[in-house]
Amino acid sequence: GARWKKKVRGTDDMDFEQLAKIENESERVNRTYDIFNEDVRLNHSKAARVEFLTTVRYIEKYLKEGDKILDIGAGAGEYSFYFARKGYEVSALELADANIAAFRKKLTTEDKIDLVQGNALDLSRYADKSFDIVLLFGPLYHLKNDADKQKCISEAKRVCKDGGKIFFAFI
């Protein structure tokens, strides 16, 4: 467990109550990932690896050759890299500076991933009905109010093709 937490200002515990008090969404998300090491989250234990592998196996049931995937809240790119290396066209959107840096560090010229730093509430850079598969595994955890959650889901629906699939993760 300790590998996926970074030490910040001498503490190794995330203070969720303090983070929750930050009203500005971008600041709250950035502060969270300054502390939390998203780059190793899905690999830090056997249980985490099972979560990742179970998720991708389920998604693969719905993929067809040539599908375009949008990974909203892509983190450090675990799902984006997996699907891009399987030959799918992947676009990744991520808000947190730390995750963008970790993602870019792993990105090679062979990786066909369009990585953009941006907010899940604003997918205006993407045309309507432009993706076969939309992954929404992170942003809903961070959005505090129902209106923002609904906007995020509406944007995901807007960019998903008719007959496409949207995969959500939310607690």
PLM feature segments, named:
Residues Q150-D162:
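A short glycine-rich, Lys/Arg-flanked "PGG" loop and its adjoining helix->strand segment in the class I
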Residues S124-V134:
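A short acidic, Gly/Pro-enriched loop at the edge of an enzyme's catalytic core
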Residues W4, G10-L63, G66-G73, E78, Y82:
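Conserved class I S-adenosyl-L-methionine
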Residues G163-F170:
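Conserved beta-strand signature within the Rossmann-like core of class I S-adenosyl-L-methionine
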Residues E78-D122:
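Class I SAM-dependent methyltransferase SAM/SAH-binding core
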Residues I133-A147:
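A short SAM/SAH-binding and catalytic strip from SAM-dependent methyltransferases
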